[in-house]
């Protein structure tokens, strides 16, 4: 899958039928709790929107962590984005992790960047 959950379940659960059951259970729970209008708004905001003029308005420090296998967010755009934010005075940094788990990799393999997060939080006011 694009998000890496199927790969993670295959690695940890093994049984394909059980993996499918878990995915369906999670999807049904998500669908009951999540407002689909939020996806529409996020989609509209991301299509044809140039936020560059507002980049300097960001006040919170940013640690952007992406997986090298992410097929949802293009990891190649991350460093240029962080460089742009820095040029606007934003405290931003990028960290790429190597994981099999795609878009969900930074959550599933959080241990791969835990030290980086700890350092980031320790220096963040």
Protein language model features and the residues they cover:
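Conserved active-site and cofactor/substrate-binding residues in soluble primary-metabolism enzymes
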Residues: 34-37, 76, 112
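Conserved alpha/beta-hydrolase "acid-adjacent" motif
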Residues: 71-80
């Amino acid at each position: 899958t694009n998000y890496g959950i199927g790969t993670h379940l295959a690695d940890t659960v093994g049984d394909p039928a059980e993996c499918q059951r878990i995915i369906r259970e999670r999807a049904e729970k998500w669908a009951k709790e999540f407002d689909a209008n939020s996806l529409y708004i996020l989609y509209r905001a991301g299509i044809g929107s140039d936020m560059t003029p507002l980049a300097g308005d960001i006040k919170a420090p940013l640690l952007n962590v992406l997986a090298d296998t992410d097929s949802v967010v293009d990891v190649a755009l991350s460093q240029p984005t962080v460089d742009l934010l820095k040029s606007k005075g934003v405290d931003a940094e990028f960290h790429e992790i190597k994981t099999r788990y795609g878009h969900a990799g930074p959550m599933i393999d959080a241990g791969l960047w835990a030290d980086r997060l700890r350092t980031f939080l320790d220096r963040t006011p």
